[in-house]
């Protein structure tokens, strides 16, 4: 394994950590509606659990309302029940074959709780990135021990890995600031 392989592997894994963090952030409800909010909700479809997006059309009706239109009429009640029983605290209302999902306004206390959740998720993502840095540095030390690279090369590669770590941690911080602003906006 070469220094370039170690660096590239670390960068790819760090990017995956960022992607997972973005995915976690998208599940945190803000006062604004977005269809991604319902992505992880499963409903029963002929005996097997499937995401709502696979049995219905999801659209934004306005800034605070999501429209869910199941493709099969008999799925309307099933989808509505799945949304109501989710952990998002939503109260869907059916109008014909369209389910309207209004986003309730967040209380100040709930907004503060959500910002704490965001910070906690961010810290978890940062720890994952730092663990990947540690793994890459251990691989570099092994190359030095096996006399495949010099200590100077290890130091340079270690600096590169540190720069990657700093870049991804800064990206996490930027995502946190954006999400907190989104949550705190009334």
From Swiss-Prot:
Record's subcellular location: Cytoplasm
Gene Ontology cellular component terms for the protein in this record: cytosol
Superkingdom of origin: Bacteria
Spans traversing the lipid bilayer: none
Coiled coil region boundaries: none
Keyword Phosphoprotein: no
A Pfam family assignment: RRF
Annotated GO biological process: cytoplasmic translational termination
NCBIfam families, per database record: frr
Family to which this protein belongs: Belongs to the RRF family.
Name of protein: Ribosome-recycling factor
Organism: Paraburkholderia phytofirmans (strain DSM 17436 / LMG 22146 / PsJN) (Burkholderia phytofirmans)
């Amino acid at each position: 394994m070469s220094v370039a392989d170690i660096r590239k592997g670390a960068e790819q894994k760090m990017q995956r950590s960022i992607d997972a963090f973005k995915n976690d952030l998208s599940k945190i409800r803000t006062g604004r509606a977005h269809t991604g909010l319902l992505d992880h909700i499963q409903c029963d479809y002929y005996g097997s659990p499937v995401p709502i997006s696979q049995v219905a059309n999801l659209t934004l009706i306005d800034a605070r309302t999501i429209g869910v239109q199941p493709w099969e009429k008999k799925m309307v009640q099933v989808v509505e029940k799945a949304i109501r029983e989710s952990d998002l605290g939503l109260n869907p209302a059916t109008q014909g074959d369209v389910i309207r999902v209004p986003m309730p306004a967040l209380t100040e206390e709930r907004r503060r709780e959500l910002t704490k959740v965001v910070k906690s998720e961010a810290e978890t993502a940062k720890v994952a990135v730092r663990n990947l840095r540690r793994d890459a540095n251990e691989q570099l030390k092994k190359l030095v021990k096996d006399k495949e690279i010099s200590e100077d090369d290890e130091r340079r590669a270690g600096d590169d890995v540190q720069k990657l770590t700093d870049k991804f941690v800064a990206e996490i911080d930027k995502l946190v600031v954006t999400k907190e602003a989104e949550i705190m906006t009334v």
